């Protein structure tokens, strides 16, 4: 019952879509209506409002971090922490408050990894930054970081074995890659948007 309750709370935390909330508060168009239609920081950046994109990034990462931090703070066992990590991530992907239309989970996963172990989170974030800096593709950076996250976990803690948190990290990586399947097709076709590209979006209530 304790694990179920913790996972439910984590899912509800994850279901708060900061891309939609921040855009609404700042008078921007719903990020699900323009660009990639993904409610995430990269798509919010396409509105031309960097402040909104940063707030979205920080908010989405924070909810992943706080969910796992709270689980640790209250002394929950590793199996509960693993379920909390998965639940907050799934909440972002399929938010109950926003008709289950969520983001792809990059920032939230980063927050989870930082809470699991700061070195794991920072190593994964640095991987994202390096790829994004050289190639300017947020999706490619996310895919590479997702592949390396479980590898970093093995280097830090050894093979997963009976470690439920390590399996949760692997599960999030697989889900993140799956959520980017459309981006993979666009990357292969040379049609993927680069970081900073603006689409017809909405810094002012949906008007370009």
UniProtKB/Swiss-Prot annotation:
Highest taxon in the source lineage: Bacteria
Q: Where is it localised?
A: Cell inner membrane
Q: Does the keyword NADP apply?
A: no
Q: Is Cell membrane among the key words of this record? A: yes
BP term (GO), one: phospholipid biosynthetic process
Broad enzyme group: transferase
Q: Which UniProt keywords apply?
A: Cell inner membrane, Cell membrane, Lipid biosynthesis, Lipid metabolism, Membrane, Phospholipid biosynthesis, Phospholipid metabolism, Transferase, Transmembrane, Transmembrane helix
The portions of this protein that span the membrane are 3-23, 51-71, 78-98, 115-135, 140-160
Which GO CC annotations does the UniProt entry carry? plasma membrane
Annotated membrane topology:
Multi-pass membrane protein
Q: Which NCBIfam families match?
A: glycerol-3-phosphate 1-O-acyltransferase PlsY
Per UniProt, subunit arrangement is: Probably interacts with PlsX.
- Listed name of the protein: Glycerol-3-phosphate acyltransferase
Source organism of the structure: Burkholderia orbicola (strain MC0-3)
Q: What is the lineage of its organism?
A: Bacteria, Pseudomonadati, Pseudomonadota, Betaproteobacteria, Burkholderiales
Q: What gene codes for this chain? A: plsY
